[in-house]
Amino acid sequence: MALNREGVITKKHGLGNLIHRTTLNAKMRIDTIHGFRKLLEDGGYRVSCKRTSPRWVTSIDVKGIDCSNCFEERFLLVENRYFADGHPAIYGHNYLCGSFVRESEAQDILSYQGSFYDLLGQFLTEEVANSINTFRPAIATAPLAEILDVAVGDPLIQWQESFIGIFDHIVCRSLISFNPAYVDLTLLRKWT
């Protein structure tokens, strides 16, 4: 079942199991890889990460994050940077909705070594059930250009992700920017 779901095989009545080797060779598949460290490793890179000290902010001041239905008074901002062979590859702004953050543990986020998805489970009071993802083209602003080591005005891909808790609350909003020199976002679409 799993191999069929991942597109590695197709089961056809009368033909049996058909193997798709091209699927096995596809790198950086966002439909099967969860976590940016693993995504970059799958691309063949040596990966390092840097997480900024979390800080409380009263608004989301990043263009590109949908703030409709956002009634939080404050957010815990956590920024993640991922490096591919020492080069800046991915930069994430993550706004954890304040009313769902375990405040007594918030400063422990900096030393937390797990993935961002595991971090949400560790530091939020509501378990994440799913996320809604939107991909959009973007242009590198001066701050993003400096962070990702690209030229101002260069095209980027941005991934906006809203994390939804088990009680249908938005518990975190993120905007991730990708350096196209190091990241290919590959997605398998099954047709059979």
Q: Which residues does each predicted region cover?
A:
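N-terminal helix-turn-helix
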Residues: M1-I19
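All-alpha effector-binding/dimerization core of bacterial HTH-type transcriptional repressors
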Residues: T23-T192
